[in-house]
Amino acid sequence: LDENSLFLDEGKNLLIEEFGKEYATYFSILSLISSSRTSRREIESVLQKNIGGYLERLENEYHLITRIKPILAKPASRNQKYVLEDNFLNFWFRFIYKYRSTIEIGNFNYVKKVIKRDFSTFAGKFLEKMFIHFLASSNKYTDIGSYWERGNQNEIDIVAINKETKKVLLAEVKLRPEKLNTRILPVKARKLFSLLKDYEFEFKGFSL
């Protein structure tokens, strides 16, 4: 990462023309989502404005974000998050756009330190996707997703359910195996125990 890096302005070049004069608001929303401020309430509390229209366009017109709900959520549930699907844009908004003022004054060492510090947490989300795809391709489960309660409480990275065998796999995903703590999963899953009373639960940790 230095002043000659080609991708410093890549995200901006890709989207600024598309978004037009309101690009700053769109960029702020995408930067917050990439930094795990994923609910409408969280984003609006930072930006201090109604962003319903922006989210709708980002999802349905620009196809940059996707709205997701926790596994087993009812169709009418308002407990939902937004995720930025493109891996490059996720990185760019998380580490380049967010620290653009630091980059503008040439303090690349600071940004490198931030990337080194936060990358394992950032990459963990992509690792989650990989393991979800792996479990889905095994054809052992009827439902697979993530779980969380309101306010992003009791987050469980992967919940895989087999309705036929009445078995549930709960998994924590970390980039580094030493960071795994599967003992917390039964505590986070208390509501799931009541929703899936007759099911057998298994707890695992996935890492590289």
Model-derived segments and spans:
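Interdomain hinge/linker elements that couple catalytic modules in large macromolecular machines
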Residues: 1-89, 93-94
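A cross-kingdom feature that marks ATP-driven nucleic-acid transaction machinery
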Residues: 78-208
